[in-house]
Regions:
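Acidic (Asp/Glu-rich) catalytic motifs at the cytosolic membrane interface
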Residues: 1-28, 35, 77, 123-134
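Multi-pass membrane catalytic core of lipid/isoprenoid biosynthesis enzymes
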Residues: 14-69, 87, 93, 109-114, ...
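Helix-loop junctions at the membrane-solvent interface of multi-pass transporters
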Residues: 53-54, 74-75, 99-100, 155
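Membrane-embedded alpha-helical segments of multi-pass transporters/permeases
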Residues: 48-52, 74, 175
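Short, amphipathic, aromatic/basic-enriched membrane-interface segments that mark the entry/exit
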Residues: 26-36, 53-58, 76-83, 131-137, ...
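C-terminal membrane-associated helical module and adjoining short loops/tails
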Residues: 91-203
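Alpha-helical transmembrane segments of multi-pass membrane proteins
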Residues: 1-9, 65-73, 116, 120, ...
Length: 203
């Protein structure tokens, strides 16, 4: 699904890339736009076919994820709602994978999906408007740290040293990543790269 989405994104951005990023594969004529589009369809078809072989309910979640990916890829330029679509793509991975393992949609799956949605939304908003964090530090900070907050709230009856250490480490990593928006000249790429790396902790 991820690879198909990347191909579809490049297919959709062909005209933009010809004007602004001529070094990209399609404008540079390393591959044709038609071939890229066919590759996207092939990857999506493969994902749906494999999911159908495993679980019908999983395929329903996959179709919802596919719809969201396509909506994002086709409308992400100059669309104020595209960060929400990106966040939804990330969140829908959890119920899809859970259903592949015949797991019910339990509280911990919903919490994981909500945490991923929140973190991805904050990251996408910062990537689009780096100054947004300075304008709205509390709401944006809450979005970024929500995965740790949800985890601590969900496990409050069985807190362990590992849980506290992991949550603290995640919070410190977020604070370190956000330095690019505050210290010295604006360095949004530093913040974005480090927040992307933080997805391993979110998961």
């Amino acid at each position: 699904m991820y690879t198909g989405g990347m191909y579809l994104n490049d297919w959709r951005d062909t005209n933009y890339d010809r004007q602004h990023r001529p070094e990209r594969p399609i404008p540079a004529q390393q591959i044709s736009q038609k071939t890229v589009g066919l590759c996207a369809i092939a990857y999506f078809t493969l994902a749906v076919s494999i999911s159908l072989l495993i679980s019908t309910s999983a395929t329903l979640w996959l179709c919802l994820l596919l719809t969201t990916i396509v909506a994002y890829d086709l409308q992400h330029k100059n669309n104020t709602y595209s960060p929400l679509l990106m966040a939804a793509c990330r969140a829908l991975l959890y119920p899809w994978v859970a259903s592949l393992h015949s797991e019910a949609l339990s509280a911990h799956i919903l919490i994981a999906a909500l945490g991923a949605f929140s973190y991805t939304l904050a990251l996408s908003r910062i990537a689009r408007t780096p100054s947004l964090f300075k304008q709205w530090p509390i709401p944006m900070g809450a979005l970024i740290t929500l995965p740790a907050i949800l985890w601590l709230a969900y496990t409050k009856g069985q807190l362990s040293l590992n849980t506290i250490a992991a949550s603290s480490g995640f919070a410190l990593w977020c604070a370190y990543s956000l330095r690019g928006l505050y210290l010295g000249p604006l360095n949004a790429s530093f913040t974005i790269k480090n927040l992307i790396a933080g997805f391993c902790a979110v998961d």
